[in-house]
Protein backbone atom coordinates (compact mmCIF):
# COMPACT_ATOMS: atom_id res chain seq x y z
CA UNK A 1 0.00 0.00 0.00
CA UNK A 2 1.47 3.38 -0.95
CA UNK A 3 2.05 6.30 1.35
CA UNK A 4 -0.52 9.03 0.72
CA UNK A 5 0.72 12.60 0.66
CA UNK A 6 -1.78 14.82 2.46
CA UNK A 7 -2.32 18.02 0.47
CA UNK A 8 -1.99 20.28 3.49
CA UNK A 9 0.72 21.81 5.63
CA UNK A 10 -1.48 21.48 8.71
CA UNK A 11 -0.27 18.74 11.10
CA UNK A 12 -3.68 18.80 12.82
CA UNK A 13 -5.42 17.84 9.59
CA UNK A 14 -2.86 15.07 9.04
CA UNK A 15 -3.59 13.67 12.52
CA UNK A 16 -7.34 13.85 11.90
CA UNK A 17 -7.03 12.03 8.58
CA UNK A 18 -4.86 9.35 10.20
CA UNK A 19 -7.60 8.76 12.76
CA UNK A 20 -10.24 8.33 10.05
CA UNK A 21 -8.04 6.11 7.87
CA UNK A 22 -6.64 4.00 10.71
CA UNK A 23 -8.77 0.95 9.76
CA UNK A 24 -6.95 0.85 6.40
CA UNK A 25 -3.46 0.89 7.89
CA UNK A 26 -2.16 3.35 5.31
CA UNK A 27 0.70 5.74 5.92
CA UNK A 28 0.15 9.49 5.55
CA UNK A 29 2.68 12.29 5.32
CA UNK A 30 2.39 16.07 4.89
CA UNK A 31 3.04 17.64 1.51
CA UNK A 32 6.39 19.41 1.10
CA UNK A 33 6.10 22.98 2.38
CA UNK A 34 7.31 24.45 -0.92
CA UNK A 35 4.25 23.13 -2.77
CA UNK A 36 1.49 25.73 -2.64
CA UNK A 37 -1.91 25.06 -4.16
CA UNK A 38 -4.22 27.97 -4.84
CA UNK A 39 -7.84 27.01 -4.22
CA UNK A 40 -9.45 28.42 -7.35
CA UNK A 41 -12.35 25.98 -7.63
CA UNK A 42 -15.95 27.12 -7.39
CA UNK A 43 -17.05 24.09 -5.34
CA UNK A 44 -15.69 21.99 -2.49
CA UNK A 45 -15.34 19.13 -4.98
CA UNK A 46 -13.25 21.21 -7.39
CA UNK A 47 -10.95 22.43 -4.62
CA UNK A 48 -10.42 18.95 -3.14
CA UNK A 49 -9.62 17.56 -6.59
CA UNK A 50 -7.36 20.48 -7.43
CA UNK A 51 -5.32 20.06 -4.24
CA UNK A 52 -5.01 16.27 -4.54
CA UNK A 53 -4.13 16.41 -8.24
CA UNK A 54 -1.52 19.16 -8.03
CA UNK A 55 0.24 17.64 -5.02
CA UNK A 56 0.22 14.14 -6.56
CA UNK A 57 1.79 15.42 -9.78
CA UNK A 58 4.35 17.57 -7.93
CA UNK A 59 5.66 14.66 -5.82
CA UNK A 60 4.80 11.82 -8.26
CA UNK A 61 2.99 9.95 -5.48
CA UNK A 62 -0.59 9.25 -4.43
CA UNK A 63 -2.17 12.24 -2.66
CA UNK A 64 -5.28 12.88 -0.60
CA UNK A 65 -7.01 16.20 0.01
CA UNK A 66 -10.20 17.48 1.49
CA UNK A 67 -12.11 20.70 1.24
CA UNK A 68 -14.91 21.62 3.56
CA UNK A 69 -17.00 24.45 4.85
CA UNK A 70 -20.22 25.64 6.38
CA UNK A 71 -23.18 26.62 4.18
CA UNK A 72 -25.98 28.58 5.86
CA UNK A 73 -29.31 28.52 4.01
CA UNK A 74 -30.42 32.03 5.06
CA UNK A 75 -27.11 33.42 3.76
CA UNK A 76 -27.43 31.77 0.34
CA UNK A 77 -24.77 29.20 1.25
CA UNK A 78 -22.27 31.59 2.83
CA UNK A 79 -19.68 31.41 4.19
CA UNK A 80 -19.28 28.31 1.97
CA UNK A 81 -15.93 28.09 0.20
CA UNK A 82 -14.76 31.06 2.25
CA UNK A 83 -15.53 29.48 5.65
CA UNK A 84 -11.88 29.54 6.75
CA UNK A 85 -11.41 33.11 5.51
CA UNK A 86 -14.66 34.56 6.92
CA UNK A 87 -12.55 36.22 9.64
CA UNK A 88 -9.03 36.03 11.03
CA UNK A 89 -9.80 33.79 14.02
CA UNK A 90 -12.46 31.27 14.98
CA UNK A 91 -13.89 33.83 17.39
CA UNK A 92 -14.11 36.48 14.64
CA UNK A 93 -15.70 34.04 12.18
CA UNK A 94 -18.33 33.00 14.72
CA UNK A 95 -19.09 36.61 15.67
CA UNK A 96 -19.43 37.64 12.01
CA UNK A 97 -21.77 34.73 11.27
CA UNK A 98 -23.94 35.35 14.32
CA UNK A 99 -24.16 39.04 13.40
CA UNK A 100 -25.20 38.15 9.83
CA UNK A 101 -27.98 35.95 11.27
CA UNK A 102 -29.21 38.48 13.83
CA UNK A 103 -33.01 38.51 13.72
CA UNK A 104 -33.14 35.47 11.41
CA UNK A 105 -35.28 32.62 12.71
CA UNK A 106 -34.56 30.09 9.94
CA UNK A 107 -31.02 29.04 10.83
CA UNK A 108 -30.58 25.77 8.92
CA UNK A 109 -27.04 25.02 7.80
CA UNK A 110 -24.89 22.20 6.47
CA UNK A 111 -21.28 21.31 6.97
CA UNK A 112 -19.95 19.86 3.71
CA UNK A 113 -16.73 17.91 3.15
CA UNK A 114 -15.29 16.43 -0.03
CA UNK A 115 -12.29 14.08 0.10
CA UNK A 116 -10.36 13.28 -3.09
CA UNK A 117 -7.52 10.88 -3.86
CA UNK A 118 -5.26 11.40 -6.87
CA UNK A 119 -2.82 8.98 -8.52
CA UNK A 120 0.80 10.03 -9.15
CA UNK A 121 -0.16 11.32 -12.62
CA UNK A 122 -2.68 13.68 -11.01
CA UNK A 123 -5.78 11.80 -12.14
CA UNK A 124 -8.56 11.72 -9.56
CA UNK A 125 -9.26 8.11 -8.60
CA UNK A 126 -11.84 8.62 -5.86
CA UNK A 127 -13.91 11.44 -4.40
CA UNK A 128 -16.47 11.22 -1.63
CA UNK A 129 -18.78 13.77 -0.07
CA UNK A 130 -20.22 14.02 3.41
CA UNK A 131 -22.94 16.41 4.57
CA UNK A 132 -24.06 17.05 8.12
CA UNK A 133 -27.21 19.12 8.52
CA UNK A 134 -27.96 21.22 11.56
CA UNK A 135 -28.76 24.73 12.72
CA UNK A 136 -26.81 27.77 13.83
CA UNK A 137 -27.30 28.63 17.49
CA UNK A 138 -27.74 32.19 18.78
CA UNK A 139 -24.58 31.95 20.91
CA UNK A 140 -21.59 29.60 21.27
CA UNK A 141 -22.00 26.41 23.33
CA UNK A 142 -19.31 23.92 24.34
CA UNK A 143 -15.54 24.00 24.32
CA UNK A 144 -14.53 21.00 22.19
CA UNK A 145 -13.52 21.09 18.55
CA UNK A 146 -12.66 24.15 16.50
CA UNK A 147 -14.01 26.57 13.92
CA UNK A 148 -17.77 26.89 13.87
CA UNK A 149 -18.29 23.86 16.16
CA UNK A 150 -19.63 25.94 19.11
CA UNK A 151 -22.53 27.30 17.03
CA UNK A 152 -23.39 24.24 14.91
CA UNK A 153 -26.37 22.56 16.62
CA UNK A 154 -27.53 19.04 15.79
CA UNK A 155 -31.19 18.86 16.90
CA UNK A 156 -31.32 15.06 16.92
CA UNK A 157 -28.36 14.96 19.34
CA UNK A 158 -29.38 18.09 21.28
CA UNK A 159 -25.74 19.25 21.21
CA UNK A 160 -23.42 21.46 19.24
CA UNK A 161 -20.32 19.89 17.72
CA UNK A 162 -18.37 21.63 20.51
CA UNK A 163 -20.44 19.79 23.14
CA UNK A 164 -19.69 16.38 21.63
CA UNK A 165 -16.78 14.11 22.40
CA UNK A 166 -14.32 13.57 19.59
CA UNK A 167 -15.73 10.06 19.01
CA UNK A 168 -19.35 11.32 18.92
CA UNK A 169 -18.44 14.04 16.43
CA UNK A 170 -16.50 11.68 14.16
CA UNK A 171 -19.55 9.43 13.83
CA UNK A 172 -21.92 12.19 12.67
CA UNK A 173 -19.77 14.93 11.15
CA UNK A 174 -19.49 15.81 7.47
CA UNK A 175 -15.84 14.78 7.50
CA UNK A 176 -16.63 11.51 9.26
CA UNK A 177 -19.30 10.72 6.67
CA UNK A 178 -16.97 11.52 3.74
CA UNK A 179 -14.18 9.36 5.15
CA UNK A 180 -16.58 6.52 5.95
CA UNK A 181 -17.65 6.49 2.29
CA UNK A 182 -13.99 6.60 1.24
CA UNK A 183 -13.14 3.59 3.42
CA UNK A 184 -15.96 1.59 1.82
CA UNK A 185 -14.79 2.50 -1.70
CA UNK A 186 -11.07 2.06 -0.92
CA UNK A 187 -10.88 -1.58 -2.14
CA UNK A 188 -11.68 -0.35 -5.67
CA UNK A 189 -8.51 1.75 -5.88
CA UNK A 190 -5.84 0.28 -8.15
CA UNK A 191 -2.60 1.40 -6.53
CA UNK A 192 -0.51 -1.03 -8.60
CA UNK A 193 -1.66 0.49 -11.90
CA UNK A 194 0.43 3.62 -11.47
UniProtKB/Swiss-Prot annotation:
Residue numbers annotated as active site: 67 (proton acceptor)
Q: Where does Mg(2+) bind?
A: 38, 67
**By its UniProt entry, which Gene3D superfamilies does this protein fall under?**
3.90.950.10
Keyword Transferase on entry: no
* Any GO molecular function: XTP diphosphatase activity
* Binding-site list for substrate: 8-13, 68, 146-149, 169, 174-175
Keywords assigned by UniProt? Answer: Hydrolase, Magnesium, Metal-binding, Nucleotide metabolism, Nucleotide-binding
Q: Which cofactor does it need?
A: Mg(2+)
State the Gene Ontology BP annotations: nucleoside triphosphate catabolic process; nucleotide metabolic process; purine nucleoside triphosphate catabolic process
What is catalysed by this protein? XTP + H2O = XMP + diphosphate + H(+); dITP + H2O = dIMP + diphosphate + H(+); ITP + H2O = IMP + diphosphate + H(+)
> Could you tell me the EC number(s) of this protein?
3.6.1.66
Q: Its family?
A: Belongs to the HAM1 NTPase family.
Question: Tell me, what does this protein do in biology?
Answer: Pyrophosphatase that catalyzes the hydrolysis of nucleoside triphosphates to their monophosphate derivatives, with a high preference for the non-canonical purine nucleotides XTP (xanthosine triphosphate), dITP (deoxyinosine triphosphate) and ITP. Seems to function as a house-cleaning enzyme that removes non-canonical purine nucleotides from the nucleotide pool, thus preventing their incorporation into DNA/RNA and avoiding chromosomal lesions.
**Subunit composition?**
Homodimer.
Name listed for the protein in its UniProt record: dITP/XTP pyrophosphatase
Organism, by scientific name, is Synechocystis sp. (strain ATCC 27184 / PCC 6803 / Kazusa)
